[in-house]
């Protein structure tokens, strides 16, 4: 998320390929409502799919392997990392997370939009390889609201909540690196804003060109060279 991209190009890979699918990265401090918003977006938009990350953390109540995460061991994670299987990887709160490179590229080549629930460190890694990946940062309406949400969630011990709140400040400091910021004070409004971001991204010139190449060529419209 290091650079804003307003040149209208579609998703470019490290090797210069232009894919018809778009890559979205949703970043937020713990408790900001990221997962709830993402799940609501996915339920309303069948043209976007969620990348399922690998993680070494233990499943939370209700989480299923292969649906929410690919839960794995530290040893297996390190083996995959050494084999360069991950588009990005990071250690967050003592646990490892990684995103499958091959799966994402296959989806985008086939015209599917991909959404990553990711931390700011991982977003930086993705941006180096897909320079037009769209970063969306979800902010809480206040730090007090963030603390209240973490407590109501009932998933963490008090000491863990304290640690997450301390980390939130440094995480929020990376919001300027995103292309878009959504303040999750009113859920329906925040969801509508997410939908607008996705819709606008799909209308960028090169996204349209990649999806409707024959029409554009027939009309004499050509894809400009990236700078």
Swiss-Prot record:
Residues reported in the UniProt entry to bind ATP: 28-35
**Cellular compartments per GO CC:** cytosol
Q: Which GO terms describe its molecular function?
A: ATP binding; guanylate kinase activity
Q: Which reaction(s) does its UniProt entry say it catalyses? A: GMP + ATP = GDP + ADP
Any Pfam family matching the protein = Guanylate_kin
Q: Which keywords describe this protein according to UniProt?
A: ATP-binding, Cytoplasm, Kinase, Nucleotide-binding, Transferase
Q: What is this protein called?
A: Guanylate kinase
Q: Which organism is it from?
A: Burkholderia lata (strain ATCC 17760 / DSM 23089 / LMG 22485 / NCIMB 9086 / R18194 / 383)
């Amino acid at each position: 998320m290091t650079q804003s991209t307003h040149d209208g190009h579609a998703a470019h890979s490290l090797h210069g390929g232009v894919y018809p699918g778009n890559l979205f990265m949703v970043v937020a401090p713990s408790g900001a409502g990221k997962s709830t918003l993402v799940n609501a977006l996915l339920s309303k938009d069948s043209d976007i799919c969620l990348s399922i990350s690998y993680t070494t953390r233990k499943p939370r109540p209700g989480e299923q392997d292969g649906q929410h995460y690919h839960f794995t061991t530290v040893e297996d994670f390190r083996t995959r990392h050494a084999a360069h299987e991950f588009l990005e990887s990071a250690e967050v709160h003592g646990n490892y997370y990684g995103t499958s490179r091959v799966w994402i590229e296959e989806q985008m080549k086939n015209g599917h939009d991909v959404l990553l629930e990711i931390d700011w460190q991982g977003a930086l890694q993705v941006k180096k390889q897909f320079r037009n990946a769209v970063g969306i940062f979800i902010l809480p309406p206040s730090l007090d609201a963030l603390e209240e949400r973490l407590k109501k969630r009932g998933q963490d011990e008090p000491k863990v909540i304290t640690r997450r709140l301390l980390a939130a400040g440094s995480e929020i400091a990376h919001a300027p690196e995103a292309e878009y910021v959504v303040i999750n004070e009113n859920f329906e409004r925040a969801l509508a804003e997410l939908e607008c971001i996705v819709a606008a991204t799909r209308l960028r010139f090169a996204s349209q060109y990649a999806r409707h190449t024959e029409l554009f060529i027939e009309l004499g419209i050509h894809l400009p060279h990236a700078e």
